[in-house]
């Protein structure tokens, strides 16, 4: 069992609140309870180890994917519900309760972020944190303070093990 709640270091001081660390099992429970979750993936998912796990997460919990950057190209032939959108625009749209969503069925109640550079996803999630009631879970290798919940800072091996635990718990 990987302890994803350790090694949490705050590298910046902006914002009035920071995310809580979350274990893979708790993240899986929260994802399973969400009515309209969205898996937001970045370009780091081009790494085969992460891409494989992203596909498994999407299929295990039947979660649509918002593919950002160049991540869409790797998801085209994976038999998942993926749509392309710019990450910053998605962050903007998620703050609008009347946004119809990527599928036209309404806004989302939870966003799960994976595959982003720390400095990038922190800025995107800042809008959701400060201007909406959206719950966000960052299942990243590093602690993301602007998410509602986040894994702690993990080694690569611990990160892959944590993602596998999350997949098995979904």
Curated annotation (Swiss-Prot):
Gene3D superfamilies: TPP-binding domain
Gene induction: Up-regulated during growth on acetate.
Pathway it works in: One-carbon metabolism; methanogenesis from acetate
Listed InterPro entries: CdhB, DHS-like_NAD/FAD-binding_dom
Keyword set, alphabetical order: Methanogenesis
Entry's Gene Ontology BP terms: methanogenesis, from acetate
Top-rank lineage group of the source organism: Archaea
Role summary: Part of a complex that catalyzes the reversible cleavage of acetyl-CoA, allowing growth on acetate as sole source of carbon and energy. The alpha-epsilon subcomponent functions as a carbon monoxide dehydrogenase. The precise role of the epsilon subunit is unclear; it may have a stabilizing role within the alpha(2)epsilon(2) component and/or be involved in electron transfer to FAD during a potential FAD-mediated CO oxidation.
Assembly notes: Heterotetramer of two alpha and two epsilon subunits. The ACDS complex is made up of alpha, epsilon, beta, gamma and delta subunits with a probable stoichiometry of (alpha(2)epsilon(2))(4)-beta(8)-(gamma(1)delta(1))(8).
Classification via HAMAP family: CdhB (MF_01134)
Family per similarity comment: Belongs to the CdhB family.
Name of the molecule in the record: Acetyl-CoA decarbonylase/synthase complex subunit epsilon 1
Organism ancestry: Archaea, Methanobacteriati, Methanobacteriota, Stenosarchaea group, Methanomicrobia
